[in-house]
């Protein structure tokens, strides 16, 4: 009965489609700062699954396809025009989530690896100078108040972020004979999200389809049962009539 095999076929099709949707490419920055200065070198690396026949990578900058097919996209000398959202895709990977890169033209820049952190995340901030010019007497400030001082330029590290670490940050230091300050950067700390609280869309769809297929199977089962019972009721065993032959005299 082909209609009994239909739910199984649908289940296999849905399962393969959902499995394919689980793979998504990932864009990583090297170095991992999301804010850089002009003339900095930035490498964007696409992590995904390739096919034996096609090892090319599709890169997108602000939704426009880039004529570059290597897994690593190198920006040798960044310019402000290179700012924007970057995404990548491979043969066996879905389009990645966007990664924002900001390129600034300035003497001093406060760098960060993220703009939004969760409670408990480590935070790294760096007071970066144009062309890596030496910077001395570096002060990191939060909401206008000094947070950390370094005689020689060093990163500001916070091992576990709390809501108290939210706020407006900037850094200042001595370059040559000039006291220079960076532009301010807003750092936000959110509550940690629980992965088990919300299912991804493909898992929700899969669960709904499983329930639908179960309902179809149940309806078909009882429908077949009723059909069989009706067939048995209609069919009646023929009655045999025996007659006694007259005996020969």
From Swiss-Prot:
Modified residues (Phosphotyrosine): 235
Subcellular location: Cell membrane
Its membrane topology: Single-pass type I membrane protein
Residue stretches making up the Ig-like C2-type domain: 31-103, 117-188
Pfam families, A to Z: Ig_2
Biological processes annotated in GO: antibody-dependent cellular cytotoxicity; calcium-mediated signaling; cell surface receptor signaling pathway; cellular response to lipopolysaccharide; dendritic cell antigen processing and presentation; Fc receptor-mediated immune complex endocytosis; Fc-gamma receptor signaling pathway; macrophage activation
Keyword flag Signal: yes
Site, as annotated: Important for receptor turnover: 217
Any single GO CC term annotated in Swiss-Prot or TrEMBL for this entry: external side of plasma membrane
Classification via SUPFAM superfamilies: Immunoglobulin
GO molecular function: IgE binding; IgE receptor activity; IgG binding; IgG receptor activity; immune receptor activity; low-affinity IgG receptor activity
Disulfide bond sites: 46-88, 127-171
Record keywords, A-Z: Cell membrane, Disulfide bond, Glycoprotein, IgE-binding protein, IgG-binding protein, Immunity, Immunoglobulin domain, Membrane, Phosphoprotein, Receptor, Signal, Transmembrane, Transmembrane helix
Regions that span the bilayer: 204-224
Extracellular compartment spans: 21-203
PTM per Swiss-Prot/TrEMBL: N-glycosylated.
First and last residue of the signal peptide: 1-20
Membrane side Cytoplasmic: residue ranges: 225-249
Record: glycosylation sites: 55, 62, 179
Top-level taxon of origin: Eukaryota
Gene3D superfamilies referenced in this protein's UniProt entry, alphabetically: Immunoglobulins (2.60.40.10)
Function according to Swiss-Prot or TrEMBL: Receptor for the invariable Fc fragment of immunoglobulin gamma (IgG). Binds with intermediate affinity to both IgG2a and IgG2b. Can bind to IgG2a and IgG2b monomers. Does not display binding to IgG1 or IgG3. Recognizes neutralizing virus-specific IgGs displayed on the cell surface of infected cells and triggers antibody-dependent cellular cytotoxicity (ADCC). Confers protection to lethal influenza virus infection.
Assembly description: Forms a heterooligomeric complex with ITAM-containing signaling subunits FCER1G. Interacts (via transmembrane domain) with signaling subunits; this interaction is a prerequisite for receptor complex expression on the cell surface and intracellular signal transduction. Binds the Fc region of antigen-complexed IgG.
Record's protein name: Low affinity immunoglobulin gamma Fc region receptor III-A
Taxonomy of the source species: Eukaryota, Metazoa, Chordata, Craniata, Vertebrata
Gene that this polypeptide is encoded by: Fcgr3a
